[in-house]
A protein has these predicted regions:
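Extended catalytic cores of very large enzyme megasubunits
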Residues: 1-242
Length: 242
């Protein structure tokens, strides 16, 4: 691929794959998975690079960072390419999709705060949703704690209405992420956490009972020391606010 063609497909200038590098050895099925998920595509939707060119793009641009410390970039890139082509080491998915691109986002996991605010705060519910959507477009996944949100049905003084609650906003997030393809290749991975002492914890634990609901999240309960002491003492652990 020439530099002009690379730029057209959102790829930073990358030297050609050295001719003496070996081809990657994969089954045809594995090769098709790599092509389907990770190679860059042109405007027509067809692959704009081979699997070997994709590996070299990743290897070269990861190695290029070490030029700052006087490393021989081409030699280091060759080392990395051999690790990839021999299946000795694979990076995370965002590295395959993001290395050597104009954005260059390589991180797989982000943890975002959610404040009990509809959007005026920098970490308000919908500001965080916006940030998370942008992260997922670059191939990253997100983790959230919904523990600061007030319980469902609580009074909202500013509007004299009732609070939606953590599970309600979890559904809002889930619906939004259902429309976003992570990195243009797959749906985003998300983790929702709620503290065990939140008044809505039982609804939260049961929110995925219907397997057709909240399909873009895994959920986890945040366990506290007080809860574990109550378990050991075989006594009730009251929820916060009750």
């Amino acid at each position: 691929m020439t530099n002009s063609t690379q730029t057209k497909h959102g790829i930073l200038p990358t030297p050609p794959v050295p001719e003496d590098l070996p081809s990657a050895v994969f089954t045809e099925n594995a090769r098709q998975v790599l092509i389907r998920r990770y190679v860059r595509r042109g405007d027509d939707g067809k692959p704009a690079e081979t699997v070997e060119e994709m590996f070299w793009r990743v290897a070269y641009h990861i190695a290029a960072v070490e030029e700052t410390w006087g490393t021989d970039v081409m030699a280091r890139a060759r080392e990395f390419y051999h690790l990839l082509s021999s299946k000795a080491f694979f990076p995370n998915s965002p590295t395959f999709t993001g290395a050597g691109t104009l954005l260059g986002q390589l991180a797989a996991c982000f943890v975002l705060p959610i404040a009990d605010d509809m959007g005026r705060a920098s970490d308000g519910i919908f500001q965080t949703l916006r940030d998370a959507a942008l992260i997922q477009q670059t191939g990253g996944g997100n983790g959230f704690s919904f523990s600061r949100l007030r319980p469902k049905g609580s009074l909202v003084k500013s509007s004299a209405g009732q609070a939606t609650g953590p599970v309600g906003f979890l559904r809002v997030y889930d619906n939004a992420f259902g429309e976003i393809a992570q990195g243009g290749t797959r749906r985003g991975a998300n983790m929702a956490v709620l503290r065990v002492d939140h008044p809505d914890i039982e609804d939260f634990v049961a929110c995925k009972t219907n397997e057709n609901q909240i399909t873009n999240f895994n959920i986890s309960v945040g366990i506290t020391d007080a809860f574990m002491r109550a378990v050991e003492a075989r006594v009730s652990a009251p929820a916060a606010g009750k």
